[in-house]
Amino acid sequence: MNNSSLVVKTSGMRRIDHTAELCIIGGGLTGISAALCAARRGVKVLLMQDRPVLGGNASSEIRMWVRGAKGLHNRETGIISELEEENIYRNPTLCYSVWDSVMWGKVMEEPNIELLLNCSCVDAETETMPDGAVRVRSVTGWQLTTYTWHTVRAKYFSD
């Protein structure tokens, strides 16, 4: 079968438009940290993650604990340290599914973050600026669990 002849009808599917100052694609530890940092400074953030849990490789899906600065007197600081300390308090047996909920809870506590889980970014719309630079204007994600297309317009994007 020639893929160029494949037509997918999407017009009957639900579509939701979102507006944010910052759209972050990817809910790994870097995406979580960027979202929390920006949101705590008053930025309206939309965090799009293609998996059902946050954390990327550090989630229960991959099971790789945070292994940055390790050693006798070394440790991670900032938001990563905050997440790890919350995990030690709530999850003394180091259960991965509880770690997932710690990360999810930190994101959901923040009123300036809108979270889209199970939403894969599949398209980006760009525009050419007067100086010739090209910038992302919006991204579109497909959320398989709800059969919904999400279009996000933002001033800034991070992937």
Regions found by a protein language model. Give the residues of each.
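N-terminal Rossmann-fold NAD(P) dinucleotide-binding loop
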Residues: G31
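Core beta-strand elements of the Rossmann-like FAD/NAD(P) dinucleotide-binding domain
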Residues: H18-A20, T146-Y156
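Conserved N-terminal/central alpha/beta ligand/cofactor-binding core
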Residues: N2-S4, K9-G12, T19, C37, ...
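Short beta-strand segments that buttress and anchor functional surface loops
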Residues: S138-Q143
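Glycine-rich loop(s) and the adjacent beta-strand/alpha-helix scaffold that form part
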Residues: D159
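Beta1/beta-strand and adjacent pyrophosphate-binding region of the FAD-binding site
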Residues: R14-G28
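Alpha-helix N-cap/helix-initiation motif
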Residues: G27-G28, R51, P92, Y147-H150
